[in-house]
Amino acid sequence: MIEDKFMRVLLMFDVPTKSKKEQKLASKFRNNLIKLGYFMLQFSVYMRICKGLSSAKSSIENVKKILPPYGNVRALIITEKQFDKMELLLGGIVFNEKVNNETNLTLFDIDSHGEFKYKNSNNEEIQINKKQEKYHQQNLFEF
């Protein structure tokens, strides 16, 4: 039921950035969030799309391991339906939201031969061209 639904983890944070050391810690925290799969929704609000509640909770546990020593960090888990009800009062949809939406997610499964089978968010299989085309640059100097 709820494990089959896409969930969104919203992280909202305020961390001090007055000294050089605080700026470095804040930057390190943001970079670690990106490494964990979060993307910026707006300043100091990051989001990650997870498949199911347990994955969302696990994602929050991973964030707890990288918290800066000072500041205020909050996490909120919402369903895709709740996220769609969000009202945009001012401004527009940012590039990160367009790229990281539910319809652009690709999931994968492993078949009986150990090969990856890619699926979209509707669990439909996607065909991937496994052959890599080789491109050769022409010689700049002909002798």
Curated annotation (Swiss-Prot):
Mg(2+) binds at D14. GO terms for biological process: defense response to virus; maintenance of CRISPR repeat elements. CDD domains: Cas2_I_II_III (cd09638). Its cofactor is Mg(2+). Keywords: Antiviral defense, Endonuclease, Hydrolase, Magnesium, Metal-binding, Nuclease. The gene is cas2. CRISPR (clustered regularly interspaced short palindromic repeat), is an adaptive immune system that provides protection against mobile genetic elements (viruses, transposable elements and conjugative plasmids). CRISPR clusters contain sequences complementary to antecedent mobile elements and target invading nucleic acids. CRISPR clusters are transcribed and processed into CRISPR RNA (crRNA). Functions as a ssRNA-specific endoribonuclease. Involved in the integration of spacer DNA into the CRISPR cassette. One of its GO terms (molecular function) is metal ion binding. Homodimer, forms a heterotetramer with a Cas1 homodimer. Its EC number is 3.1.-.-. The lineage of its organism: Bacteria, Pseudomonadati, Campylobacterota, Epsilonproteobacteria, Campylobacterales. It comes from Campylobacter jejuni subsp. jejuni serotype O:2 (strain ATCC 700819 / NCTC 11168). The keyword Metal-binding applies. Belongs to the CRISPR-associated endoribonuclease Cas2 protein family. This is CRISPR-associated endoribonuclease Cas2. SUPFAM superfamilies: TTP0101/SSO1404-like.
